[in-house]
Amino acid sequence: MSTSPIQYRLIKKEKHTGARLGEIITPHGTFPTPMFMPVGTQATVKTQSPEELKQMGSGIILANTYHLWLRPGDELIARAGGLHTFMNWDQPILTDSGGFQVYSLADSRNITEEGVTFKNHLNGSKMFLSPEKAISIQNNLGSDIMMSFDECPQFYQPYDYVKKSIERTSRWAERGLKAHSRPHDQGLFGIVQGAGFEDLRRQSAQDLVSMDFPGYSIGGLAVGESHEEMNAVLDFTTPMLPENKPRYLMGVGAPDSLIDGVIRGVDMFDCVLPTRIARNGTCMTSEGRLVVKNAQFEEDFTPLDHDCDCYTCSNYTRAYIRHLLKADETFGIRLTSYHNLYFLVNLMKKVRQAIMDDNLLEFREDFIERYGYNKSSRNF
């Protein structure tokens, strides 16, 4: 799709793995890959300003179609001039399709060929989301990268169910492409599904690749399967996708999963993990997980991470951050959130350098050992 506003440029392949260094060109700028994308569910990354996100090196952020459709409404955002203007963010934005949120409402939804009926989680009213509506909402939001409406089956669903599901997702993808009213300034990605079944992943990938999307997402992972099962699916799925298009692994943010995804050829990742755990005082550091609210840090006047040069670690101590969190001060959450986001954005920067140096496997081994991962307990 040469007229697509989304272009992928391969810079270098790592010699020993499937990892690749590249960049993705969008209407609102170019960002390097592999890249971790902070999640701004309600058109804001929780507690962080756009200036802070730029400062830490976030080249692209994600916003949530489902939540913005319900509140404040996609038509209001369109009248504001689109999501970039509405939230004062002049760099790339990716929107999901809303599908994952709808499917997480398992007790109140009904799937048909036309779309999904579900209850609005805010007021209980009946709502309907179709492939066409999901595209229309995203066209109003004006994101640089959009997602096709898909069904996200549980990883351990029976084979026959998953087969019917991916075939419907392919039909929905085709309907979404036809409904896309802004193909010259918004790029629409297809989403490969298929749970853990290699032949169904292949069928899904072949269907979507034949439609010539400007990029492809790998969905249906990080939904309860083991780390090893996720890697196995990536091992056989990413080679099914075109080398000249971006590859996006949805909903993945644990540090080892990011590195292992890159090794298997993934370019883009997103997850709420860094900000969600930060609100409970859990921090990612170069030496593993640190729960700064714990009593042992009451008089610890050192940074969260001795090897981190982020704003938080350059200015504040564990003892001070612990005090803020124990006192329910919002500034404490701002500091832990900034640090965790910076940690993952900076991890991807280090990964990009390791690809350039052809030593990603050595980098992974050193990182895993320092972080304290072991087979009995991953501790993200």
Curated annotation (Swiss-Prot):
Ranges for the region named RNA binding are 251-257, 275-279
Among the Pfam families in the record, one is: TGT
Please name the catalytic residues of this protein: D96, D270
Which parts of the sequence bind Zn(2+)? C308, C310, C313, H339
List of residues binding substrate:
D96, S97, G98, G99, F100, D150, Q193, G220
Mind giving the lineage of the organism this protein is from?
Bacteria, Bacillati, Bacillota, Bacilli, Lactobacillales
Q: What is known about what this protein does?
A: Catalyzes the base-exchange of a guanine (G) residue with the queuine precursor 7-aminomethyl-7-deazaguanine (PreQ1) at position 34 (anticodon wobble position) in tRNAs with GU(N) anticodons (tRNA-Asp, -Asn, -His and -Tyr). Catalysis occurs through a double-displacement mechanism. The nucleophile active site attacks the C1' of nucleotide 34 to detach the guanine base from the RNA, forming a covalent enzyme-RNA intermediate. The proton acceptor active site deprotonates the incoming PreQ1, allowing a nucleophilic attack on the C1' of the ribose to form the product.
What is catalysed by this protein?
A: 7-aminomethyl-7-carbaguanine + guanosine(34) in tRNA = 7-aminomethyl-7-carbaguanosine(34) in tRNA + guanine
This protein's gene is called tgt
- Entry-linked InterPro entries: ArchSynthase1/Queuine_TRR (IPR050076), TGT (IPR004803), TGT-like_sf (IPR036511), tRNA_ribo_trans-like (IPR002616)
Which GO biological process entries does UniProt record here?
queuosine biosynthetic process; tRNA wobble guanine modification; tRNA-guanine transglycosylation
- What are the record's GO terms for cellular component? cytosol
- Name listed for the protein in its UniProt record: Queuine tRNA-ribosyltransferase
Q: Which GO terms describe its molecular function?
A: metal ion binding; tRNA-guanosine(34) queuine transglycosylase activity
Quaternary arrangement and interactors, per the entry?
Homodimer. Within each dimer, one monomer is responsible for RNA recognition and catalysis, while the other monomer binds to the replacement base PreQ1.
Which pathway is it part of? Answer: tRNA modification; tRNA-queuosine biosynthesis
Whether Zinc counts among this entry's keywords is yes
Q: Which UniProt keywords apply?
A: Glycosyltransferase, Metal-binding, Queuosine biosynthesis, Transferase, tRNA processing, Zinc
List the residue ranges forming a coiled coil, or say none. Answer: none
Similarity comment: family membership:
Belongs to the queuine tRNA-ribosyltransferase family.
UniProt KW Glycosyltransferase keyword: yes
Q: Which cofactor does it need?
A: Zn(2+)
Q: What is the cofactor note?
A: Binds 1 zinc ion per subunit.
EC number(s) from the headed UniProt entry: 2.4.2.29
